[in-house]
A protein has these predicted regions:
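Amphipathic alpha-helical packing segments from all-alpha helical-bundle domains
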Residues: 69, 113-141, 149-153, 157-164
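Short secondary-structure transition hinges
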Residues: 90-130
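Short amphipathic alpha-helical elements of helix-turn-helix/winged-helix folds
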Residues: 17-21, 92
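Short, basic, alpha-helical segments at the C-terminal edge of helix-turn-helix-like DNA-binding modules
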Residues: 62-68
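Helix-turn-helix
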Residues: 13, 21-55, 59
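Hydrophobic alpha-helical connector segments
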Residues: 59, 72-98, 148-155
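Short coil/turn segments at alpha/beta junctions that flank glycine-rich nucleotide-binding fingerprints
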Residues: 24-28, 96, 139
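N-terminal intrinsically disordered/low-complexity leader segments
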Residues: 1-9
């Protein structure tokens, strides 16, 4: 096996172990020493691949956000209807429980020190949420006393509750 392949496999092993630990404990409680001890990862190998806890978390976030985007947009890559979007969120949670927990933690309870690093990825999903909601509103007939702004605020609230549910479900 070539050196590059070994390095890639070691890196994947670390990421897989970290995904589980971050999903189980969250960013704030996660400890690298514990990860190394529980999963038999040498600290030197971990620090050769990642600069520390935040770098490892950001790598897990990137992977989780990529998987989420693939599931949410579906095969056609188009903005889904609200019903399809919610179903795909649930599908993401079912298929990728660790990734979904990390994803929802990043969306709802972003670690303060990583907000700037995670903001571009969050923006992609916030924009997708807006597009899904706009699509729903454009296809709906609103009551006279409800304008688009109020409808959007209501839909955002529902989405926040939905994400919170998946963050707290174990």
């Amino acid at each position: 096996m070539k050196k590059e392949e070994k390095t890639r496999l070691r890196r994947e092993k670390i990421i897989t172990a970290a995904l589980f630990e971050f999903a189980t404990k969250g960013y704030q409680v996660f400890v690298i020493n514990e990860l190394c001890k529980v999963d038999g990862i040498a600290k030197g190998v971990l620090y050769h691949n990642f600069s520390g806890k935040s770098d490892l978390y950001l790598t897990c976030i990137q992977e989780s956000f990529e998987k989420a985007l693939a599931v949410f947009l579906g095969v056609d890559g188009q903005v889904p209807s609200l019903a399809d979007y919610m179903e795909r969120c649930h599908q993401f949670y079912q298929q990728y429980p660790e990734h979904s927990h990390i994803f929802f933690e990043a969306m709802i309870a972003t670690p303060e020190e990583l907000e700037a690093d995670i903001a571009p990825q969050k923006a992609i999903f916030l924009d997708l949420n807006e597009q899904v909601c706009q699509k729903l509103i454009s296809e709906s007939k609103l009551k006279e006393h409800i304008d688009e702004k109020r409808a959007m605020a209501y839909l955002r609230l529902i989405q926040d509750m939905f994400r919170s549910y998946y963050l707290t479900v174990s």
